[in-house]
Amino acid sequence: MRELAPDTILSVRDLRTWFKTKRLTAKAVDGVTFDLKRGQTLAVVGESGSGKSVTSLSIIGLLSRPGAIESGEVLFRDSHGQVHDLAKTSQRGFRKLRGREIAMIFQEPMTSLNPLYTVGDQIGEMIALHENIGRGETRKRALEMLGHVEIPDAANRLDDYPHQMSGGMRQRVMIAMALACNPSLLIADEPTTALDVTIQAQILDLLRRLQAQFGMSILFITHNLGVVAEIAHEVVVMYAGRVVEQAPVIPLFQKQKHPYTEGLLACTPNAERDLDPDGERKALYSIPGSVPPITALPPGCAFEPRCRYAISACTTIPPQLESAGANRLARCLRSAEI
């Protein structure tokens, strides 16, 4: 097992997660590599089908069959300094890590919370699973967590059921459950997608404050670059199961080194950019085409059929993830020209 840098909490190297059947193999994640530093937020961005959620499920050991890690290394440093290769960890090993060292929140809290149990019981169950404390202390800790996630009148909401809360409140409960045992790593899989813009901003602000308070690292999965600008330190852009660009957040927004990243940003509404010279509203830009099936990727660059910079070499030569400037990587034959 290789050594981790002192400030690195998660290091993924050449991760391949494939879904195999008798007829075909779907390479949902194909050679993904990135590092997440302690106390920072790494955003993984891409359209539906890019492989970002499968990457997160591979890390936390929640893949469904026939999905399986084919190869690669996922090194995680726990709160005691011990390094685990999550790609080789058994489900028994994951049960010790999930909740205590690594936690996850999902896109739709209503389907993640049990409708038959109160929110206090569900937060308390997470605490009782990992800590040897009595029921009274467990309930006290659950109440403290509701306070941390800023649920008003927490003492009276502790015995509420999920259906008695709004979508934003339920997501706060999910965050309280995830952070109940003070994990080192929080994986957030599109936690604001199902919320309206106002509540979305409140949840992002809450995550930033809790990160400063608890000192956790966050792996943030999203398709929304506006959210990335609010919360991330580093950005990984995925397309068709591969990383196509990686950079610190500010340089990425200032200048993109891959056409797909450029296209994603161009799709984001902008009040000034979306006006023509006469002041009329222009049609919102969209990237032409769609993500190719991962079972039938083109032989060259996977983005070539949709790319306005494509040349003949792009149809036959698979680009490699290479340096594109200081602390930047891009998978494009023409990244130096973009």
For the regions a protein language model found, what residue spans apply to each?
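Conserved ABC ATPase signature
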Residues: 160-165, 169
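ABC ATPase NBD coupling module
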Residues: 80-103, 129, 251-256, 292-298
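P-loop NTP-binding/switch modules centered on Walker-like glycine-rich loops
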Residues: 47, 61, 187-191, 195-278
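Conserved ABC ATPase "signature" region
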Residues: 137-156, 265-266
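A short, proline-enriched helix->beta-strand linker immediately N-terminal to the Walker B motif
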Residues: 180-184
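Short catalytic/signature loops enriched in Gly
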Residues: 2-8, 83, 155-156, 246-338
